[in-house]
């Protein structure tokens, strides 16, 4: 290759508008033409990340000493890789492995929830093609935010049957949201109503498709809902300490049947929002009296 063509190749690789997929595809040419030392810092860091993920010792040997990256440079490269590379997901197995790891690093290590729509899009695109989505779904839910649920619920309204089926599968733990007979828009509206009622009482379990065919990645803490105490979605702990009276109520609450726990927590949540004074009075009663009132549906709250 002449020097003019070589310079043209270097200029193309270091172009601001370059997509990560192009860099990835051109790795063999970069090696054949020995262009590693001509790469800009973005590309050098990106290839170093690829080498670590793929355990490619040859590639790592070429790029390890090119740049001394810091956390900011690594984050910037990861964001570029996902932002420009997600559209080319399913390019090949190695590429998908890299994209999975990049998504995981951005979500788990850098706590960047802005990438969640891109990751959700990758999940559903892969599923349409019949590819496995287990790893991506796992890292997606590691964000441990109800934003994940909202993004998935959006696919309930998709015209693509596979999108709807996957959304139902991932949201099946939510009652009344995934019934086959329900209108798709109605399912979505039901989900939004459920989320509004339960959002501050949700915690994430870590269950995923890698270990079970019926994962429940998220649950409602009925204790927290009954006491109207927000909890951390990360560690399932109340954000405020419980009073002795609240602890005593919980002890009685735990003696109820599961169905009555659900009824009481739902009634408590709705009464708290509609009439705080009545809720405070209701919380002074013994749990059996609370159940009696809840089942009677006093005040139109059920």
Predicted segments with their positions:
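Intrinsically disordered, low-complexity boundary segments flanking structured domains
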Residues: 65, 105-107
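Long, helix-rich interaction regions
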Residues: 1-100, 128-133, 142-302
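C-terminal helix/turn sub-motif of individual leucine-rich repeats
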Residues: 107-108, 141
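Ankyrin-repeat interhelical turn detector
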Residues: 110-111, 144
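Short N-terminal edge-element motif at the start of the domain
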Residues: 101-104, 115-117, 125-127, 131, ...
């Amino acid at each position: 290759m002449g020097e003019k063509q070589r310079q043209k190749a270097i200029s193309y690789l270091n172009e601001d508008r370059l997509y990560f997929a192009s860099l990835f595809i051109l790795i063999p040419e970069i090696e054949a033409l020995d262009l590693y030392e001509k790469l800009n810092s973005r590309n050098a860091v990106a290839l170093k990340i690829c080498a670590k993920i793929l355990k490619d010792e040859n590639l790592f040997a070429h790029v390890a000493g090119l740049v001394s990256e810091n956390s900011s440079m690594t984050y910037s490269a990861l964001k570029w890789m996902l932002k420009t590379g997600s559209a080319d997901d399913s390019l090949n197995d190695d590429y998908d492995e890299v994209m999975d790891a990049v998504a995981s690093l951005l979500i788990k290590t850098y706590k960047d929830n802005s990438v969640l729509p891109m990751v959700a899009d990758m999940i559903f695109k892969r599923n349409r093609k019949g590819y496995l989505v287990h790893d991506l779904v796992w890292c997606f839910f590691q964000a441990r935010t109800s934003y994940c649920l909202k993004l998935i619920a959006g696919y309930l309204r998709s015209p693509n049957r596979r999108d709807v089926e996957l959304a139902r599968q991932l949201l099946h733990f939510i009652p009344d949201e995934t019934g086959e007979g329900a209108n798709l828009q109605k399912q979505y509206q039901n989900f939004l109503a459920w989320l509004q009622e339960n959002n501050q009482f949700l915690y994430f379990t870590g269950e995923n498709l890698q270990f079970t065919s019926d994962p429940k990645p998220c649950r409602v803490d009925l204790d927290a809902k009954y006491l109207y105490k927000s909890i951390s979605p990360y560690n399932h702990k109340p954000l405020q300490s419980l009073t002795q009276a609240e602890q005593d109520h919980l002890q009685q609450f735990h003696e109820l049947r599961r169905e009555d726990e659900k009824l009481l927590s739902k009634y408590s949540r709705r009464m708290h929002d509609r009439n705080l004074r009545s809720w405070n009075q209701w919380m002074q009663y013994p749990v059996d009296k609370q159940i009696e009132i809840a089942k009677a549906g006093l005040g139109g709250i059920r």
